[in-house]
Every structure is written in structure tokens, then in C-alpha cells.
Amino acid sequence: MNRIKRLANQKKYSRLFFDDAFYIGFFMFLVVPMGMSLYYSFCDYDILSPPVFTGLDNFKHMFSDGTFFKTLKVTFFFAFVSVPLKLLFALFVAMLLLKNSKLSGFYRAAYYLPSIIGGSVAVSVLWKRMFSSNGVINSLLQAIGIDCTVSWLGNTNTAIWILILLVVWQFGSSMLIFLSALKQIPASLYEAAMVDGSGSVYRFFKITLPLLTPTIFF
């Protein structure tokens, strides 16, 4: 009886230990920084000197600045285009890799690699060289007879699309999440739908997509 109580207490303390570790990390690395950011938004603060409370002056300056709404518009456009494209591409590749093959492990690693190195300085320099006025992209266009000397990252009309492409290129982490979620869908659902004569499009929209909704909005 005492042994059972000791085991129960050990499980209880272990659970409390892991729960406390999560809550401490959540509080220290999320709640505290968010609270500090909110407080500093009402202050005049330059890191080197103590913050001076200024009330709503920062917000008044922000809304009176003509570039604020333009920046907000570009940010929303970037998010509304890049996020759906990244999710769609990740889901498409995950469904292709769902079929087991000898090279599936290699493909998963290859597709995941950009997610690891995508934020590095080397990749930033590489993309800058690729899309500069005398970069690789313009050289390839000139090789097929298209005279192009535009600086893709220096042009306001094209720079946003290059940045979106850079985000979509790092779809590997989302692809692995989708791949794991797809494997959790019972095969019996697809088999029953096929017996009823349902096509692949119907199965995707009536089975796959609804069951992936929690993952998509995660």
C-alpha cells in the first residue's frame, strides 16, 4: 500500500515538475517580454537611459506618420499572400511524400533543409546575389534572349514578391507537420469513400481537408 502511494506521489511530483517548467518558460519568455514591450510603448526609451513615461505620445506620432498605414498595408499583403502559399505548397508536397518510397527519407530531409538554413546570413547573401541587377536571374534571362537589368530587391514592385518567395521556399517545417497529420487520418475513411465511388477530389475536400483543419489553424 505504501509503495503504491509512493509511486502515485512520484507521478504527481513528476507531473508538477514538467508542468512548472512549461509555465515558468511560458511566463519568462512570452508573458514578461510582451508586458515589457507594452510598457515601453508608453515610454521614451533608448536602451542606454532609463525609460521615461510619455503616455500616448508614441501612438500619436505613429498614427500621424504618413508611412505607418502604407507599412501596415504592405505587411498585411505580405502575410495574406505568403502564409496561404506556404501552407498550400507544404500540403501539396506532404501529400506527394505520403506514399512510401525508398527515397522518401531523402526527399523529406532535402525539403526540410531550407527551413534550417533559411534565416542564415549566407542564404541572405546568396539571394541578394541571385536577384541583383547583374545576378544569376538576370543572367539566365539574358541567356534566353530577354534583356533584363532590373534590381529585383531594389524595385518596390518586385521586392515584396522576392520576400514572399523566400518565405514560401522555407516550407519544410510545415510540410513535416502536415505529413504527420496526414498519417493520423484513418485509411478506412478513404477505403469507405472509394467503395461509395468517391473520386480523389471529393475525398480531399470531404475527408482530408476537414481532418487537417486543426493542423492548418494551429
Which role does the model predict for each range below?
Residues 2-3:
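Membrane-interfacial, low-structure loops and terminal tails that flank and connect transmembrane helices
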Residues 8-218:
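A structural signal for multi-pass alpha-helical bundles of membrane permease subunits
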